[in-house]
Amino acid sequence: MQQNIWFTPEGIEDLLPEEAKKLEFYRRQLLDGFELSGYDLVLPPIAEFTDSLLTGKGRHLAVDTCRFTDQESGKMMGVRADMTPQVARIATNRIKQTGIQRLCYVGEVLKTRNNKAKGSRSPIEIGAELFGHSGVESDIEVIELMVSSLHNIGLQDLTLSLGHVSVVDELMNVSGLTPTQKENLVDILLRKAVPEYTDFVAELTVTEAQKQAFELLLSLCGDIATVTEAMQGLAGLSEPMQRHLAHLQSVVDHFAGFDGLKIHMDLADLRGYQYHTGMIFSCYAAGRKMYQLARGGRYDGIGSEFGSAQLATGFSLDLRGALDLLTSPAEAEKEIVYAPNVYDADLQAEIAKLKQQKTIIKRFYEFDALEKGSRYLALQASQWILSVK
């Protein structure tokens, strides 16, 4: 019974030395790659007042946010469940830079619920966000950074999944759906409930062209030829629809020639509908039952609650969740030298010199505890020299 106090909550795990070393290696690899692409590192706090943490586009995180009362102010605080709203707050309220901003971030987040399909309740989130540009060029830049970052940490066999939530949004608008009908349709598409969708479309009072567009929607799922089908079946509905599909076509054209990158499309995918405003994208590891490695999308308008709505696109990945797919970094075995636990200025100088040479220094308390063959620092003729037991 007593041992139960050592158990961690469901979905919250320790990282032991080998895993922690591996995670830190790849964290550094990713951040270095972001920096070389012009993205500046920011580190938001682990907790904030819920007034800012769960406002605007962050409202959808309320059910996943662990909350508590701040003993200093009496106000409600929350532990972040996603870092993107925090980064948007920093970009809007703290940096206040005009033009394009590129920011990256890393940190642990905490969720109230354990979703086994998505892994840990305490992911280590790392990502990059681009603020201040609305064109297809910034979407392409962010997707390219996502793909190249995964390649740089050794994940080569990738599937890039693309969608655009504005396609469904515009179809609902041109068809004159009521707010209730829109809400019902979004719910049906999120659940992938095909029979319900068929019944819903059959009951719509819309033009024949609009009904055909709704009937076509679920079939717009597959390879890059999907965009051509969508252009033929949907582009004529409105000018905004044509723009959304042309935007998608530009992204597909850019990535179609990437070696080892498969492209999958699903124009009925509404993941993050309450949050995203345009392109949505994700990367999957093909050899792991289509495990989602990274995801992102456009979320224009974020930051309006802080006084300045931002054009924004970005992506993030759970580094802890990806550990099993990453190989342990190959590194030269470091030399270990043992040093006695005494204070001596000359000894400290010798230790500092060895550490500069990347030698690991471990203190020993009893000489007899050292194994035979161990290297250690010994005081001989008033000098600290390396000896072997």
Swiss-Prot record:
MF GO annotations: histidine-tRNA ligase activity
Family listed: Belongs to the class-II aminoacyl-tRNA synthetase family. HisZ subfamily.
SUPFAM superfamilies according to UniProt: Class II aaRS and biotin synthetases
Gene of this entry: hisZ
Miscellaneous comment as given in the Swiss-Prot or TrEMBL entry: This function is generally fulfilled by the C-terminal part of HisG, which is missing in some bacteria such as this one.
Pathways per UniProt: Amino-acid biosynthesis; L-histidine biosynthesis; L-histidine from 5-phospho-alpha-D-ribose 1-diphosphate: step 1/9
Keyword Lipid metabolism attached: no
Name of protein: ATP phosphoribosyltransferase regulatory subunit
Alphabetized Pfam families for the sequence: tRNA-synt_His (PF13393)
A Gene Ontology biological process term: histidyl-tRNA aminoacylation
Disulfide bonds: none
GO cellular component assignments: cytoplasm
Binding partners and assembly: Heteromultimer composed of HisG and HisZ subunits.
Function (record text): Required for the first step of histidine biosynthesis. May allow the feedback regulation of ATP phosphoribosyltransferase activity by histidine.
Keywords on record: Amino-acid biosynthesis, Cytoplasm, Histidine biosynthesis
